[in-house]
C-alpha cells in the first residue's frame, strides 16, 4: 500500500511538472496554430542557467535571475525566429522551430563541453515528508499545489484582464482581431513570456527530482508535455493540465512494475490512440477552416 501511495504521489508530481511545460505548448498553439518545438529546450536552458548561476551566486538570487533570463530567452526566440515568418506558410514556421531547438541544444553542448551538469540542491523542496506511511520529497507535495495556484492565476489573467481578453480574441480569430486593432505582436509576445516562465518554474521542480542536466534534457519532457497537450485538447489549458497529470501518474505506475522499460512507449502509444480515436483531445474543439 505504501509503495502504491508513493508511486501515485510521484506521478502527481511528475504530471504537474509536465503540465507547466504543456501549458506553453497549448497557449502558443491556441494563438499562432504553431507547435513550438523549441519549448522543451527552453526548459532545458532554464536548468543549465540554474547550474551555472548557483556556482557563483546564492540560490535566492539565482532563482529569480533564472526566471527573468528564461522569459527573455522565450521572448527573443519569438522575435527572432517566429515574428519574421508571421505571414509565411506553417511549414516554414515549423522548420524554424525545429532549427531553434537544435540551435539551443548545440549552444548547451558548447557551454557544458558535453559533460553532464549536476543540478544544485534547493533546500526548500529537497527535504522529505511522510504521507499515508509513504516517505517522499517535499517537491512531490509542493508541485501539484504550485501548479494549481499558477493555473488559477493564469485563468484569472485570461478571463479578467485586458491582455487576457485580447489573447482570447486572437485565439478565436487571428485576422479579425488584427482588423479590430488588437496589438497582435504584443499578445504573441506575452504568450511566449508566460509559457517560458512556466517552463522555468517546471525546470526548478523537475531537476530537483532528476538532478542531471544535459543538452537533450528537454527533449523527452518536452515531447511528453506535447502529448499531454494533445491528449487534453491542444489549445485548452485545463485539458493540458489534466492530460499531464494522467500521463505522469500512468508513467510512474508503469515504472513501478516489471514493464518499466515501456514507460516512455506508453506516452507515445497514447498519442497514436488519441489521434485515431479523438483527434481533438478531451476538451479540444473541432476547428473549421474559413473560406
Q: Which residue stretches match the model-derived regions?
A:
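Membrane-interfacial amphipathic/re-entrant helices at transmembrane-helix boundaries
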Residues: 1-20, 49, 59-61, 88-95, ...
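Membrane-embedded helix boundary and interhelical linker motif in transport proteins
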Residues: 9, 31-76, 80, 257
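Helix-loop-helix "hairpin" substructures at the membrane interface of multi-pass membrane proteins
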Residues: 14-15, 134-213, 237-242
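Short, non-helical or kinked segments that cap or interrupt transmembrane helices
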Residues: 16, 25-47, 87-92, 163-166, ...
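Transmembrane alpha-helical segments in multi-pass inner-membrane proteins
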Residues: 18-20, 57-68, 192-199, 206-269
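Hydrophobic core segments of alpha-helical transmembrane domains in multi-pass membrane transport
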Residues: 47-52, 67-73, 100-108, 144-155, ...
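Alpha-helical transmembrane segments within multi-pass membrane transporters and channels
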Residues: 58-100, 107, 242-247, 278-279
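Transmembrane helix-bundle core of multi-pass membrane transporters
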Residues: 84-160, 187, 253, 258, ...
Amino acid at each position: 500500500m505504501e509503495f502504491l501511495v508513493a508511486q501515485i504521489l510521484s506521478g502527481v508530481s511528475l504530471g504537474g511538472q509536465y503540465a507547466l511545460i504543456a501549458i506553453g505548448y497549448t497557449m502558443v498553439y491556441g494563438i499562432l496554430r504553431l507547435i513550438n518545438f523549441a519549448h522543451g529546450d527552453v526548459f532545458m536552458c532554464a536548468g543549465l542557467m540554474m547550474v551555472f548561476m548557483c556556482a557563483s551566486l546564492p540560490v535566492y538570487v539565482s532563482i529569480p535571475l533564472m526566471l527573468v533570463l528564461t522569459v527573455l530567452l522565450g521572448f527573443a526566440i519569438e522575435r527572432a525566429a517566429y515574428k519574421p515568418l508571421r505571414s509565411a506558410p506553417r511549414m516554414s514556421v515549423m522548420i524554424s522551430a525545429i532549427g531553434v531547438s537544435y540551435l539551443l541544444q548545440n549552444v548547451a553542448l558548447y557551454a557544458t563541453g558535453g559533460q553532464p551538469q549536476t543540478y544544485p540542491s534547493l533546500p526548500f523542496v529537497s527535504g522529505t515528508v511522510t504521507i499515508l506511511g509513504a516517505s517522499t520529497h517535499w517537491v512531490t507535495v509542493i508541485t501539484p499545489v504550485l501548479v494549481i495556484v499558477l493555473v488559477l492565476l493564469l485563468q484569472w489573467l485570461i478571463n479578467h484582464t485586458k491582455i487576457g481578453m485580447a489573447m482570447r480574441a486572437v485565439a478565436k480569430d487571428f485576422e479579425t482581431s488584427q482588423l479590430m486593432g488588437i496589438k497582435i505582436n504584443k499578445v504573441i509576445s506575452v504568450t511566449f513570456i508566460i509559457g517560458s516562465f512556466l517552463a522555468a518554474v517546471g525546470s526548478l521542480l523537475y531537476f530537483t527530482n532528476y538532478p542531471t542536466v544535459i543538452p537533450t534534457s528537454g527533449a523527452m519532457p518536452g515531447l511528453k508535455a506535447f502529448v499531454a497537450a494533445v491528449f487534453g485538447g491542444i489549445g485548452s489549458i485545463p485539458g493540458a493540465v489534466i492530460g499531464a497529470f494522467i500521463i505522469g501518474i500512468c508513467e510512474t505506475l508503469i515504472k513501478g512494475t516489471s514493464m518499466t522499460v515501456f514507460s516512455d512507449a506508453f506516452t507515445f502509444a497514447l498519442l497514436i490512440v488519441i489521434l485515431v480515436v479523438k483527434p481533438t483531445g478531451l476538451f479540444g474543439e473541432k476547428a473549421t477552416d474559413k473560406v
